[in-house]
Amino acid sequence: MVVQLKTARLLLQIVDAFIEVWGAGRVGVHLAPRGDSHDMGDADPLATFGYVVEQLDQRNVAFIFTREYEAEDSLQPKLRPKFKGAWIANEKLTPESAKRILATEQADAVAFGLAYIANTDLFERLENDLPLNQVQFDTLYGPSAEGYTDYPVFEQLEA
C-alpha cells in the first residue's frame, strides 16, 4: 500500500488541484495500466492502478480514459468495477474488439486513434460494417499532409 501511495501521489495531487479549480465533473484522467511504453513498467500494475482507480472514484472525477490493448492479461476488466464514472477504452481496438468491450460493459465508450487518422469516415464505416483503410505508418509524424488528409472515404473507394 505504501508503494501505491508513493507512486500515485503526484497524479492525485494534480487531480485534486484540477478539481479545486474546475470541479470533479469536469476532470478526467488518462491512464495506461500496462505502463509498457518506452520501457516503463510496474512491479504490480494491478495493485498500483487498482489503488489509483479507487482514489479517482472517491474523488468523483468525470471519466477515466484507458490506453490498454485487449489481451488475456488485460487489467481493464478488473479495474472497471472499481470506478462508477464514465470509462473510455482505447488502444489498438478493432471494430470487433470495440463492440465486445462495449457489450461486456468493460467500458462506456471506446476511442480510436490511428484508425481514425486513416478513416475520417470511421463512424460510418463502423456503423455499416465497412472495411477500414490501413494506416500508412511511414507517413505518420511527417512534415507533409500525406498520410493525414489523403486517405479515401468509402464512397471514393467505390467510384
Where are these regions (language model features)?
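Flavin-dependent oxidoreductase catalytic cores
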Residues: M1-A159
